[in-house]
From Swiss-Prot:
This is Chemokine C-C motif receptor-like 2. Keywords: Cell membrane, Disulfide bond, G-protein coupled receptor, Glycoprotein, Membrane, Receptor, Transducer, Transmembrane, Transmembrane helix. GO terms for molecular function: C-C chemokine binding; C-C chemokine receptor activity; CCR chemokine receptor binding. PANTHER family: C-C CHEMOKINE RECEPTOR-LIKE 2, CELL ADHESION MOLECULE. It comes from Sus scrofa.
Length: 350
């Protein structure tokens, strides 16, 4: 009889402890990002969308029409612009949901998830490809290939990056569940897109995946290649300007996405850092939201970097705007393939 009563009592005690811990957690109300989203997101994201759409389309046009796709770097930069356009497509929907708190439905939430994740991871991977390609070119690891073969060889890595970005996104899509609020399904910008994050394993797994593939991998490749190249590359040497552009693109990417990755990591592993109190939890949620908003503006920054650090791009942009304003344009003045050889002559005008 004693053995029969002791086991249920032990189980009952464990059940009560779990209930108490859950009650304690429920006392801490979840952070409500709606006020911050309604104030900050609409105007900021509308500006980012309009500026990003304009300058990334200009990048695509200039890369295809003027600079051409005979250089591997141009192909990767063109793909970066496409990544940014994928990312930009999600912004109007976040603005609408922040303003009107509408119910977009589960299919649209999944489409936003796909565009957001694929755009983010593909941009990180193309930054890695750009850095590695510069590293290879400096040390002449592919110097015996012809230009045509080099460009043909860049098509496979570009396609592979898009395939990998889609595969990396699949866990989020497979485990995605829209959240319920006021009896409506909603997809939130302010919270990580990998819900059901109630399962601790998947929350940790998907957070580490984001940290490693979206931040630490580009950071490691950048530091390794930069240190090796910096020892041999001299100021004014041929290729220095392109090195400076690739370097700046990667640094800006890491600076804008680094704070979000740190905040996301601390939020997911808060119990290991004694940050599970109500105030700490709210501060982490707010920090994750703010850093995510800042990082999202990155999709309109790259083309501005081209204007400041790529002299050839700046000249082609000048001629493109000149042709648009000219009532009688002369297409023979700027042949599509006369880019690299004409740059020294054009540079004297700037």
């Amino acid at each position: 009889m004693a053995n029969y009563t002791s086991a249920p009592e032990d189980d009952y005690d464990v059940f009560i402890e779990d209930d108490l811990s859950n009650d304690e957690r429920e006392l801490c109300s979840p952070y409500d990002p709606q006020a911050l989203l309604a104030q900050l997101v609409p105007y900021l994201f509308i500006t980012v969308f309009l500026v990003g759409l304009l300058d990334n389309i200009l990048v695509v046009l200039i890369m295809v029409k003027y600079k051409g796709l005979k250089q591997v770097e141009n192909i990767y930069l063109l793909n970066l612009a496409v990544c940014n356009l994928c990312f930009l497509c999600t912004l109007p929907f976040w603005v609408h949901m922040a303003w009107h708190e509408g119910d977009p439905g589960e299919p649209l939430c999944k489409i936003l998830l796909v565009l957001y994740s694929v755009g983010l991871f593909s941009e990180a991977f193309f930054n890695v490809l750009l850095t590695v390609q510069r590293y290879q070119k400096f040390f002449q690891m592919r110097g015996f290939f012809s230009a045509t073969r080099m460009v043909a060889g860049s098509i496979f890595p570009s396609a592979l990056v898009w395939v990998i970005a889609v595969l990396v996104m699949l866990p989020e899509l497979a485990f995605y569940k829209p959240q319920m609020e006021n009896q409506k399904y909603k997809c939130f910008f302010g919270r990580p897109l990998f819900l059901p994050a109630d399962e601790t394993f998947w929350k940790h797994f998907l957070t580490l995946k984001m940290n490693i593939l979206g931040f630490l991998l580009p950071l490691f490749v950048f530091v390794f290649c930069y240190v090796r190249m910096r020892r041999t590359l001299k100021f004014g040497e041929r290729g220095y300007d392109l090195f400076k552009l690739v370097f700046t693109i990667m640094v800006v990417f890491l600076l804008m996405w680094g704070p979000y990755n740190i905040a996301l990591f601390l939020s997911a592993f808060n119990e290991h850092f004694s940050l599970h109190g109500c105030e700490s939890s709210h501060n982490l949620d707010r920090s994750t939201l703010i850093t995510k908003i800042i990082a999202t503006t990155h999709c309109c920054v790259n083309p501005l970097l081209y204007v400041f650090f790529d002299e050839a791009f700046r000249k082609h942009l000048y001629h493109f705007c000149h042709l648009c304003n000219d009532t009688a344009p002369q297409p023979t003045e700027e042949p599509a393939q006369g880019t690299s050889r004409e740059e020294p002559c054009l540079s004297t005008k700037m």
